Amino acid sequence: MIFDMDGTLLDDLSLISHVAGSVLQAAFGTPEAEARIHYLATTGMPFEAQLAQLYPHAPADERRRVARTFHERKVTEAYAHAGPFPEIPKLLKRLSQGGWTLAISTGAEAEMAEIVLEREGLRFWFEDLLGSRDGTKREHLQEYRRRYPSAPLILVGDSRFDMEAGQSMPGVTTIGRASTVHGWTLTPADLRRWGAAWADYSLARLPEVLDQLFPSDRTPTAEARTSGNGPASAARGPPRREGPGPRASRRRG
């Protein structure tokens, strides 16, 4: 099971969107409120890809410079103040105890995602993490599919891009977190229209939903996994964790 981070695990979308609006105004002259909406409308992809879509005529070097500024300010102005949605710690524990293998696919830089998740006590639950330098959401899914060729994948995200990325690959089930921030709303109906098998404003009911989507008699076996290191798939196994502990004790593969 593959989780997006910003806006899905972390309640940080509003903070990040204000950073983006300020950065885009300073770099390209777009009014901040308008730039913020443009960012929200294209969220779900790496920021560099958003810039290429929003400002295709800007030189690539300039877009890279703006992206660096955004990532730096996101750390100090968003991640420094953001935390997980209230249900997330308990949810991750329930999923792990239920045998689900968990991983991260984020448009943020992997190194910063690692730090934030560690700070919030969440990194322990995830087997692997792919970030912006590892490609787009679709490319992350392709890599997960390569490592888990026979197992269905579940992508949990909060954007149209997340839903469409999941729909672009056979065998991927998409789950959506609906959101409401100032000036921007994505309803459960929006996310279902873009392909979500289930969507809500909270993920607290996700374990029960998964039991309906993946009954025990359809649970993939261990043979569905490939050997070696591995990110998350929808494959289940016996419960493996009782709670956070030393990182060295985490079993991979």
Task: Enumerate the language-model features and the residues they cover.
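A short, structured active-site edge motif that brings together acidic residues
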Residues: 38-39, 122-137
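Short, acidic loop-to-helix structural element flanking the phosphoryl-transfer center
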Residues: 76-104, 114, 139
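Acidic, Mg2+-coordinating phosphoryl-transfer loop and its flanking beta/alpha structural elements
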Residues: 156-200
